[in-house]
Amino acid sequence: MTARPRAVSGLDVTLLGRFVIRSADGREIRIVGRHAQALFTLLALTCRPRTREAIATDLWPESLGAATGPLRQALYQLRTALAAAGLDLDMVLEADSETLGLRPEALRSLDVARFEACTDDPFCAPEAAVAQYGGDLAEGLGHDCFAGERERLADRYEDALAVVARQRLESGDEEGARLAAERLIGRDPLREEAHEVLIAVHGQTGTRSQVVRQYRRLCDVLARELAEAPLPETDATYRVALAQTIARSRERAARLERSTGTNLAVVG
């Protein structure tokens, strides 16, 4: 006896980083093929029916008039995956001969929407926004139509990461500040505020050579990429960091001298 398709109570969709779709009961729905994954991603981000021609042109502009071929294949793969999961296709897809879209009730949660809502909400902590960002949008799909949205979301993430690095530093969490700043620099070496945080961290916990190396890295990348010098506030942080390391070195030397003097007195 053929199983009856289940009504959809909402899909949980992850598009940031690894592509994942889960049913309301937590089961992962596997969609095979990058074209099918790209189609679902575009439909989830659009949230309204669009003409099939417009969808095909967005996803496969290089195919010109033949783009409906890849669309038919991707739609077939998508329908097959949803049906294999036992879902009622009519409750997920809104489709006719001209248009295609996801029904609004088909999505219970979308990580992109949660992340954007958090970055828009002044009461949502930047730490929460950073935690919700699982990776760049549509990683590995390679479709140019996602490039603009991917960059926009990445900018929001990097802005939140910069705030997190600064907040951790100000709260005394030097290690957490270092990790956040290094992650930001790994994504964008031109983020001067992240370099400044690392300079400050090295000033508080590191050595003079670490402070100097970090400052020189910043100077080099700014000169090479922008033909600019560090901002005055970064220079001020650099001077403070140098002074902190020098003070610690002198304190250690003084302790060593006192210890040596005490030992000599005991021997004498």
Language-model regions: role of each:
Residues 66-77:
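Short amphipathic alpha-helical interaction segments
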Residues 1-6, 28-30, 34-36, 45, ...:
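Intrinsically disordered, charged and Pro/Gly-enriched terminal/linker segments
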Residues 15-37:
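A structural micro-motif at secondary-structure boundaries
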Residues 75-86, 219:
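C-terminal flanking helix
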